[in-house]
Design a protein with these regions (language model features):
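Membrane-embedded transmembrane alpha-helical bundles that form the catalytic cores
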Residues: 1-515
Length: 516
């Protein structure tokens, strides 16, 4: 079931919420159990065959967590370490089978010539997210962070539908206290208003913006051929904005849905294209995945404790595996490795500036504009590998982006040029093919309209900042002028966005991160 579907918005969600608050008047535990069962129904709407897998995964990790906690309390460190290794290994084997078996079967098939079995393993929806969430739980138990082991609360923690399909990746210690609080189970009209506002802003981002710009991105990646400069950049930028508003929309909708139930999720998306460098980008993009990779992979590899060279190697390996987490394919591996190189160069540059006695935090306005622009271009280049179906296709698009395939302006647009301008462009090798003029205009109109939005406009969490919309939305932020309040003006704005979002449900599409 999709957040951006009629059956969810007008069926599942209102029923789940009304029954939850109705049951909660008599029993908080029964209400939590209802929400867990409703979440399983939500998951099963996609494919009921994988509901037992989700339940078995939750039961296995819960039992392992109980035994692990006993070993930790008894200070049986060797037994605790062995159980942790076994449980994490079992989770990774499960994830590896469903997510990577087809990839390795494909490699074997290309080597051996035997293609049997390739593509027959279907990836269960959300398996990467609920697996990583539970690995984090096991690690937190081992470290002594987990204090509560109620089985119903744990089941809700794993299956909780606002995060189940595409994140955020949760920590047990940040969710369990909320499931225990009495106020979570009381209907709060302010929380409902805030939650629905965030949800419908997210719906607008997904159905109007992301799905609206998608047709101007997909053709390039489905059949790249030898795109010219304008076609290559147009498609790459269109996808850059499609992915941004798709993931931003999903993140808003997840936070908004959860807020209706009185539960705050961690912030997972924070205007990443405003980043001045790649380090900052990964503090803003898929923030809970970045947190997981840092806490449970980068630090486990040694972090920055074993010298500069080892630190850079750890960064690169972490991002390489982060790319592999996104998908079983060489394009994802290359994307992760490229971001690993970006981070190594970024850290090296900052270290060099410090050695030269410069303060990396101090920069001019022009320097900030340049830093943001070069970071954005680097991200766009990396997205080409992320979206392309093969490395050859990605390289073909990049060749077009650097102008190796020439530049073409549709003949219909060339009619607006003066004869001297057209002659000059023709001299420089520009071609003027027939057709495609209106499409190119619309494509670049989207790009011109969306670029200032992602670079300058406040995001949803900032607009609702005074209400602390997410767990890690820190207090030190300066409130923006465009700040939401329960006023008639804001009601009209949100109603307009809601109407546009709902009217666009005729072209329902999955969120891009559902495939991971």
């Amino acid at each position: 079931m999709l957040f951006n579907s009629v059956e969810f918005i007008f069926g599942f969600f209102p029923i789940a919420a009304l029954v939850f608050f109705g049951i909660a008047r008599r029993s908080h535990m029964a209400a939590a159990a209802w929400l867990a069962l409703a979440s399983l129904f939500f998951y099963g709407w996609w494919n009921w065959a994988y509901v037992p897998l989700l339940v078995a995964s939750a039961a296995f990790n819960y039992v392992c967590g109980l035994h692990l906690a006993r070993f930790v309390r008894a200070r049986r460190s060797r037994a605790a370490g062995a159980l942790l290794a076994f449980a994490v290994g079992a989770n990774l084997l499960l994830l590896g089978y469903f997510k990577y078996a087809n990839f390795f079967l494909g490699i074997w098939g290309s080597v051996s010539g035997n293609a049997s079995g390739i593509g027959q393993i279907i990836l269960p929806l959300g398996i990467s997210f609920f697996t990583f969430t539970q690995i984090a739980f096991l690690a937190d138990v081992y470290r002594g962070y987990v204090k509560e082991y109620n089985p119903i609360h744990y089941g809700l923690f794993v299956t909780y539908f606002p995060h189940l399909i595409a994140g955020p990746i949760l920590h047990h210690r940040e969710m369990m206290p909320q499931f225990q609080e009495a106020r979570t189970y009381r209907l709060n009209l302010e929380a409902v208003a805030i939650g629905l506002t965030i949800f419908f802003i997210g719906l607008f981002k997904k159905t109007v913006i992301a799905d609206g710009v998608a047709p101007y991105a997909s053709p390039l990646f489905l059949n790249p051929g030898a795109p010219d400069l304008l076609a290559a950049w147009g498609g790459a930028l269109a996808y850059t904005f499609q992915l941004y508003f798709d993931f931003s929309g999903y993140s808003d909708m997840a936070i908004g849905l959860s807020r209706v139930f009185g539960v705050k999720l961690p912030l997972n998306f924070d205007s990443p294209y405003k980043a001045l460098n790649m380090i900052e980008f990964w503090r803003r993009w898929h923030m809970t995945l970045s947190r997981f990779l840092r806490d449970y992979l980068y630090i486990s590899l040694g972090g920055n404790r074993k010298g500069t060279a080892r630190r850079y190697l750890n960064l690169f390996v972490t991002m390489l595996l982060g790319g592999l987490w996104h998908g079983a394919g060489w394009t994802f591996i290359f994307w992760g490795g490229l971001h690993g190189v970006y981070l190594v160069v970024n850290h090296g540059w900052l270290a060099l500036r410090r050695r030269l006695g410069q303060d990396p935090e101090r920069t001019t306005t022009g320097g900030r504009v340049f830093a943001r622009a070069i970071t954005f271009v680097a991200v766009v280049v990396a997205w080409v590998f992320f979206r392309a179906t093969s490395l050859d296709d990605a390289l073909a698009i990049l060749r077009g982006m650097v102008g190796l395939n020439g530049v073409s302006i549709p003949a219909t647009l060339a009619t607006y040029l003066t004869p001297s301008m057209r002659a000059a462009l023709d001299h420089w090798g520009m071609t003027f093919p027939l057709g495609g003029g209106s499409r190119l205009v619309v494509q670049y109109s989207w790009i011109v309209a969306l670029l200032p939005l992602v670079m300058l406009a406040p995001n949803t969490q900032e607009i609702l900042g005074r209400f602390q919309p997410a767990l890690n939305f820190h207090d030190g932020r300066r409130l923006v002028r465009l700040s939401w309040r329960p006023t008639p003006a804001w009601a009209a704005i949100v109603a307009t966005l809601t109407a546009c979002g709902l009217l666009s449900l005729t072209r329902v599409s999955e969120f891009l991160y559902y495939q991971f």
